[in-house]
Regions:
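Bacterial N-terminal signal peptides
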Residues: 9-18
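N-terminal cap/lid segment of alpha/beta-hydrolase-fold proteins
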Residues: 28-45
């Protein structure tokens, strides 16, 4: 979820989710650390990275505040079976910023144009985590003839904020406000220029080498030091409500579209060795209920809990995500 209060609050606000620190391993794939294919979509360029061959192209959309590097543990494995593409939304990674709101509809339009220009033809199997999961649903509604399957990893949905905010007695919206404050703070520091060894650098950028390994980590850190990156985070978070409303306006059954929804099996706010609070348990139950509702929108929909994984499942249990993608791919082909 885009406003997942179950993460450790401080680290969540700084580097998106504390679980990255605990579970990320060094990436053996330096391809994610540099531009691969920058496609002109009308005066600005969107970055794509594809590898593998096959009749169906798997397209990955990252969680909020991330570029395609979020899939560095999954994309190479899927590419052993078919063509697999990651992309950077406008303003992230190696993509140019957009002179318009960073909503789901606009992200989908950008991706659609980029795939066309790059000659990456359908059918597509879309895979999205968190905000990327919301975008994948919007794409499937806008271009149903192109999308032959969906794998939604802890996906954003149009009413999750209100439902979980009610259960958590306002904590979701409190987190949203803190998230925006931190983004604004880091944007200001990026504009001034991060200084080596500074508290601002540690708080806003962190140790990406620990997260992604020496090559990719250095590249991600370099991107996170740019004002463009933080401005895009500000813009994207400001557009969350609009993106929710766009998905709400499109919402309808998916028919018989192969669909697999992956749900976290770990409550990130639970203290190891201590009983889970009633509020945490209620929120986890509601999160799973929301995902089951999404899966029920397709006659070929399934929902699966991934034990040991939290919100960013592709970091903690990448094999489970790869397995899900290959299962849906088999149904398509």
């Amino acid at each position: 979820m885009k406003k997942n209060w179950f993460c450790n609050i401080l680290l969540t606000l700084i580097v998106s989710c504390s679980l990255f620190i605990q579970v990320a391993e060094a990436s053996p794939n330096a391809a994610f650390a540099k531009p691969q294919q920058r496609v002109d979509i009308g005066g600005r360029k969107l970055h794509l990275y594809c590898s593998g061959t096959g009749n169906t192209t798997v397209v990955f959309d990252a969680p909020g505040s991330h570029g395609g590097w979020a899939w560095f543990k999954v994309q190479p494995e899927v590419a052993k079976h078919t063509r697999a593409c990651v992309y950077d939304r406008a303003g992230f990674g190696f993509s140019d910023p957009a002179p318009r709101p960073n909503t789901s509809e606009n992200a989908v339009e950008d991706l659609h144009k980029a795939l066309q220009v790059a000659g990456i033809n359908p059918p597509y199997l879309l895979v999205g985590n968190s905000l990327g999961g919301g975008n994948a649903q919007v794409y499937a509604y806008r271009y149903p003839e192109q999308v032959k399957g969906l794998v939604l990893v802890e996906p954003q949905t149009e009413d999750e904020t209100e439902r979980l905010n009610k259960i958590t007695e306002g904590k979701i919206k409190q987190f949203d406000a803190m998230w925006k404050e931190v983004n604004a703070y880091c944007l200001g520091e990026a504009i001034k220029g991060f200084k080596k060894g500074s508290k601002a650098l540690a708080n806003c950028v962190g140790n990406q080498v620990t997260l992604y390994g020496p090559v990719l980590g250095k590249a991600v850190a370099s991107i996170m030091m740019k004002p463009t990156y933080w401005q895009t985070r500000v813009d994207e978070s400001n557009a969350f409500n609009s993106s929710d409303e766009q998905l709400r306006a499109l919402r309808k059954p998916f028919g018989d579209l192969p669909l697999l929804v992956l749900t976290r099996g770990v409550n990130e706010n639970a203290i190891p060795g201590k009983p889970q609070s009633a509020m945490n348990k209620a929120a986890e139950d509601e999160n799973e209920k929301i995902h089951k509702e999404i899966a029920s929108l397709s006659t070929k929909g399934k929902q699966r809990v991934i034990p040991g994984a939290s919100h960013i499942i592709q970091f903690e249990r990448p094999a489970a995500v790869v397995q899900a993608v290959l299962e849906v791919l088999k149904l398509i082909e």
